[in-house]
């Protein structure tokens, strides 16, 4: 029988490292609550990014998925994860930096992605995962609360921006619940939150997502400027394009919907 999460980590003398952005969760009931939001079943194939000392890993395995592949950069955690694997043969362990992995080499069928993401790579990794949306059933991600609010933000709100647009052209997004700093060791300075991201049945192509990235980078750099001014260098006939799409030339970045940005990208 496995010891508690905290005792297991202590037995391997694993303390959180700042360079990996580690904040461990030792509360198994919180881990179970997070995994319940994923709706995984015995037929699910799951990828967990950054399992650390295995809190979420255990809760996933209790659901008895068809397979669970964990990707961990910290070699100190591998022996601990190997011990968990001894009880759960459906667990596969990859020691690698997820940012250096070609995810398409790992995913051969629809998967659920679960992660307590380090804050410093959260946004970058979310966008990378969105570009593989056709291979993903859903994602349950723990991120900084502010980032989750940006992902879920509606047009004409303060939090609405590039990340909101990119996420919402690819997927349905839903904030599940907040997680207090006291749930982690060590305590971060800010709240976290759980977000559920469910890719659309027919998400945009990677090429189209890249175009939306390019457009939103320009317009949200000057979010109070009119769209026609922000995009003039990228799209010389921007006035005609916006008029054709029935988008007000005088609108600002925060006024356009994700669908509006997708429609503009399709004209490039």
UniProtKB/Swiss-Prot annotation:
It is found in: Cytoplasm. GO terms for molecular function: 16S rRNA (adenine(1518)-N(6)/adenine(1519)-N(6))-dimethyltransferase activity; RNA binding. Pfam families: RrnaAD. One of its GO terms (cellular component) is cytoplasm. Its main location: cytoplasm. S-adenosyl-L-methionine binds at residues 23, 25, 50, 72, 97, 116. Its EC number is 2.1.1.182. It comes from the Bacteria. Keywords: Cytoplasm, Methyltransferase, RNA-binding, rRNA processing, S-adenosyl-L-methionine, Transferase. PROSITE patterns: RRNA_A_DIMETH, SAM_RNA_A_N6_MT. It catalyses: adenosine(1518)/adenosine(1519) in 16S rRNA + 4 S-adenosyl-L-methionine = N(6)-dimethyladenosine(1518)/N(6)-dimethyladenosine(1519) in 16S rRNA + 4 S-adenosyl-L-homocysteine + 4 H(+). PANTHER family: DIMETHYLADENOSINE TRANSFERASE, DIMETHYLADENOSINE TRANSFERASE-RELATED. Specifically dimethylates two adjacent adenosines (A1518 and A1519) in the loop of a conserved hairpin near the 3'-end of 16S rRNA in the 30S particle. May play a critical role in biogenesis of 30S subunits. Belongs to the class I-like SAM-binding methyltransferase superfamily. rRNA adenine N(6)-methyltransferase family. RsmA subfamily. This is Ribosomal RNA small subunit methyltransferase A. It comes from Rickettsia typhi (strain ATCC VR-144 / Wilmington).
């Amino acid at each position: 029988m496995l010891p508690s999460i905290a005792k297991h980590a202590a037995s391997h003398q694993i303390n959180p490292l700042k360079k990996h952005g580690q904040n461990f969760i030792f509360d198994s009931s919180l881990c179970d609550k997070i995994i319940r939001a994923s709706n995984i079943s015995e037929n699910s194939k799951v990828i967990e990014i950054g399992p650390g000392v295995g809190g979420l890993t255990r809760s996933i395995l209790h659901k008895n998925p068809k397979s669970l592949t964990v990707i961990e950069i910290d070699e100190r955690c591998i022996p601990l994860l190997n011990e968990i694997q001894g009880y759960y043969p459906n667990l596969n362990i990859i020691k690698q930096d997820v940012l250096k992995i070609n995810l398409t080499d790992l995913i051969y069928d629809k998967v659920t992605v679960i992660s307590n993401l380090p804050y410093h790579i959260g946004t970058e990794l979310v966008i990378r995962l969105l570009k593989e949306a056709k291979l993903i059933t859903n994602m349950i991600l723990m991120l900084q609360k502010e980032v989750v609010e940006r992902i879920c933000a509606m047009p004409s709100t303060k939090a609405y921006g590039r990340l909101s647009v990119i996420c919402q052209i690819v997927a349905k997004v839903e904030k599940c619940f907040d997680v207090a700093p006291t749930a982690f060791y060590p305590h971060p300075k800010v709240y976290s939150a759980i977000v559920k991201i469910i890719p659309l049945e027919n998400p945009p192509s990677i090429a189209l997502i890249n175009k939306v990235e390019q457009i939103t980078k320009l317009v949200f750099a000057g979010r109070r400027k009119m769209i026609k001014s922000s995009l003039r260098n990228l799209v010389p006939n921007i006035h005609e394009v916006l008029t054709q799409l029935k988008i007000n030339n005088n609108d600002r970045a925060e006024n356009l919907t994700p669908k509006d940005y997708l429609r503009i990208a399709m004209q490039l």
